[in-house]
């Protein structure tokens, strides 16, 4: 929907119409689509002769969806408030000329990919190289945009290792050839703290591990306001992952991940580990 009111129509009073057919105002973007977590700049064009004398006013019909603020050079910045649809309006200060454009605010669930180990993976992965390194903050999502999500080791691991192993999951080899691990006979429990999550939003956690060994079942326990458990056999694992769905963070926006040998782990050192994790927002 795009409506223009120019020479034959007034935004306020038909008796005050400026009949010059040379004068116009127009939003350059006939429709605007943006995510809830981003802003957008829109611009307006006015006729060349009188443009400098026009003072433009910007507004949105529903301020519960977005707000708009005029800036220099006949532009305005839109800030989303909530998912929904509304209309942008620009008008001259005298109310004689105005123009409308559609605005749609959407929310695409964020997904973050994390690769554990010293060999970096390309985007969209966030690379956590060593369990003794500082944690990751403002991780990039699948679109390459910063998020509020962070991850840090809060229960130590034995270390990291690289075995050069491949996968059949479509992941880069760099994601499957290195990992964080622990020998359970020395470190029976390892884990992460995931921060910056949104209260009231549920998340899915997906894990992948691969080692050329035997009996390395790993238990993943994800804990927020609720919790879930999954078991993954890492032995020669080219294509198996596990998911824990529907996890809601605690009141601080935090989820804890605890890892330990699974009940069927018979590896001599009680080896357990993880190569990659995928953190996904679930749609409401």
Which residues does each PLM region occupy?
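C-terminal motif of bacterial Sec signal peptides marking the signal peptidase cleavage site
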Residues: 7-10
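Extracytoplasmic soluble-region selector
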Residues: 12-109
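Surface-exposed, short loops/turns at beta-strand junctions within beta-sandwich domains
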Residues: 80-84, 198, 249-251
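Extracellular recognition modules
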Residues: 87-91, 206, 258
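Low-complexity, Gly/Ser/Thr/Pro- and Asn/Asp-enriched, turn/coil-prone segments
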Residues: 108-185, 246-284
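A short beta-strand element within beta-rich, extracytoplasmic domains
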Residues: 190-192, 199-213
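Short, surface-exposed beta-strand/strand-loop-strand elements in extracellular ectodomains
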Residues: 209, 213-228
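Extracellular carbohydrate recognition and processing domains
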Residues: 227-249
């Amino acid at each position: 929907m795009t409506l223009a009111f120019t020479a034959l129509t007034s935004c306020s009073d038909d008796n005050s119409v400026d009949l010059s057919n040379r004068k116009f105002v127009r939003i350059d973007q006939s429709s605007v689509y943006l995510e809830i977590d981003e802003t957008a700049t829109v611009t307006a064009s006015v006729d060349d002769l009188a443009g400098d004398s026009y003072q433009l006013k910007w507004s949105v019909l529903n301020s519960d969806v977005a707000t708009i603020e005029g800036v220099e050079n006949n532009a305005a910045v839109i800030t989303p408030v909530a998912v929904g649809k509304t209309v942008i309006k620009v008008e001259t200060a005298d109310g004689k000329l105005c123009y409308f454009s559609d605005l749609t605010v959407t929310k695409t669930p964020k997904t973050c990919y994390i690769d554990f180990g010293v060999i970096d993976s390309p985007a969209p992965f966030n690379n956590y190289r060593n369990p003794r390194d500082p944690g990751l903050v403002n991780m990039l999502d699948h679109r390459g945009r910063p998020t509020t999500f962070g991850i840090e080791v809060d229960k130590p691991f034995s270390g990291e290792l690289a075995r050069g192993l491949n996968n059949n999951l479509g992941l880069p080899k760099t994601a499957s050839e290195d990992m964080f691990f622990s020998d359970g006979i020395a470190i029976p429990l390892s884990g992460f703290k995931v921060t910056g999550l949104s209260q009231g939003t549920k998340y899915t956690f997906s894990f992948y591990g691969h080692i050329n060994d035997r009996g390395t079942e790993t238990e993943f326990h994800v804990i927020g306001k609720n919790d879930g458990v999954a078991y993954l056999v890492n032995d020669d694992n080219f294509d198996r992952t596990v998911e824990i769905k529907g996890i809601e963070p605690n009141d601080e926006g935090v989820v804890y991940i605890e890892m330990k040998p699974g009940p069927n782990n018979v590896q001599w050192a009680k080896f357990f580990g993880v190569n990659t994790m995928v953190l996904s927002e679930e749609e409401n």
